[in-house]
Amino acid sequence: MASTFSKLLTGRNASLLFATLGTGALTTGYLLNKQNVCAAAREQHKLFPPSADYPDLRKHNNCMAECLTPAIYAKLRNKVTPSGYTLDQCIQTGVDNPGHPFIKTVGMVAGDEESYEVFADLFDPVIKLRHNGYDPRVMKHPTDLDASKITQGQFDERYVLSSRVRTGRSIRGLSLPPACSRAELREVENVAITALEGLKGDLAGRYYKLSEMTEQDQQRLIDDHFLFDKPVSPLLTCAGMARDWPDARGIWHNYDKTFLIWINEEDHTRVISMEKGGNMKRVFERFCRGLKEVERLIQERGWEFMWNERLGYILTCPSNLGTGLRAGVHVRIPKLSKDPRFSKILENLRLQKRGTGGVDTAAVADVYDISNIDRIGRSEVELVQIVIDGVNYLVDCEKKLERGQDIKVPPPLPQFGKK
């Protein structure tokens, strides 16, 4: 159980706490010296004008590169969050990775909850660009985890092979993974697994530390889509999220392997409900029930998730703000996937396609991973219903093409639930 002292120790005022409690000049001196070194580095940084430090983004194709201007950079360059995170650290992954051939990446991350406020002049336009016009300066994000509102949640299993819903949650008071110290990573792991031990019934399970798994066990879990990949993605490595791997990383799952929690990958936690077949309503019901129970258990231990009414749940990448939810299916659509209207149909249904194994993978045997594009501005119930209605439309199109009938491109969905 995390004590108040433990939370303060990993918070923003550790050096002041040590000095006040008199726990020793050595510890206090180390922390203060670290702060002094960082402050000295920032002062050295200021010797150069912002124009001399501005990144070359002329060949970049990501949201950060599109929104960052010399004026915004000059305004934000020397600002730091309470944990010492800077604008240059936020954007480095987008500077190092110009873009993606199929998916427009965000190009920046947050190092802590405060990053979204301190660097709002850049984060806000990036969020608006990435999230279909959602403006965090004037809009509020809705939350709804009432799975009973879902309709027509059973897919035709001749086409839909598996169903999955995931989200992320961050623990308030600790840095996000790009800025996490080893101590903070271990505290995240401790907070999470201590809470998860309280899950009962069909949610009960156990935790597996990555550092204690064999290579064969890890790869088997990855191949079965239970475990996150090894941190080889440049988007993760350039953001600093692969540091100290596999320290304090792991996976918790129930005994049926239908409810899983990843620890300390891109986010503090990723909560996942999944199963074979096409019963998305059941998957979402378990997701909502499990997520509510995890939050209750964490709150019982004196912690809470990062959340505010503008951005919803706070996560590392701006692409996952709001619900953090991705509801997806593996669906076999050999005829529709070859139709020239396929991409437009997906766009109008607010869906996206990935290969069978996710981003940057091919579709094996005409099986695609289809999921919602949006994360913020719509509730969890709305997003899952969009996926259900959209996938049913795709399956209906596939059946028509099998019969030699024509299909239509549906009208675009209204923005943010507008009628």
Swiss-Prot record:
Note: Mitochondrial creatine kinase binds cardiolipin.
GO cellular component terms attached to this protein's record: mitochondrial inner membrane; mitochondrion
The reaction(s) this protein catalyses: creatine + ATP = N-phosphocreatine + ADP + H(+)
A single BP term in Gene Ontology: phosphocreatine biosynthetic process
Protein name as catalogued: Creatine kinase S-type, mitochondrial
Ranges where the record places region Cardiolipin-binding: 40-64
Role of this protein: Reversibly catalyzes the transfer of phosphate between ATP and various phosphogens (e.g. creatine phosphate). Creatine kinase isoenzymes play a central role in energy transduction in tissues with large, fluctuating energy demands, such as skeletal muscle, heart, brain and spermatozoa.
Signal peptide, first to last residue: none
Entry annotated with the keyword Phosphoprotein: yes
Entry's family note: Belongs to the ATP:guanido phosphotransferase family.
Organism: Bos taurus
Domain Phosphagen kinase C-terminal: 159-401
Every Phosphagen kinase N-terminal domain range: 46-132
Location of Phosphothreonine modifications: 356
